């Protein structure tokens, strides 16, 4: 079976993008997604988007983690999808799209800048401290643990992020982990 796809990269993550007309609607969807996302035997990616027509908005997005599980939303990858949809002539510079977490908006500013407007997070926890890293549980369409850190070096973030993701507080599924640093000029580095 041949499935045409696009690969995109956003903030250190990579994603496979497939138009729904090119993806078979079959029972084996989960296993196909697992095989495609496998970095050793497949294309390899952090997740996969299936892009479908929408009767209400510009398009509909279904996001799947690399293990084949469906997730309501992935903001990072949605930026890549937005750029692809614009560059392929399917939408204009500004677009609205449906996800499992509701409607989101994006605007193409350049080939390297996509601005997203997301809905307000549904809830946030009291401060949690897994792996001695103070932060908050936030649901912005997908589950995230967000913590401030002065160190955003890749090795540090990967090692601590992996430990937090697998911490017993977030089992059995784990959690997306984000580190941020506040700049003196009011910017936020993620």
Regions found by a protein language model. Name each.
Residues 73-84, 122-129, 141:
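Short, surface-exposed, charge-dense and proline/glycine-enriched linear segments
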Residues 129, 133-154:
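Internal active-site segments that recognize and position negatively charged phosphoryl groups
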Residues 118-135, 162:
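Active-site glycine-rich loop that binds ribose-phosphate moieties when present
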Residues 1-110, 146-190:
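A glycine-rich beta-to-alpha transition motif near the start of alpha/beta enzyme domains, typified by
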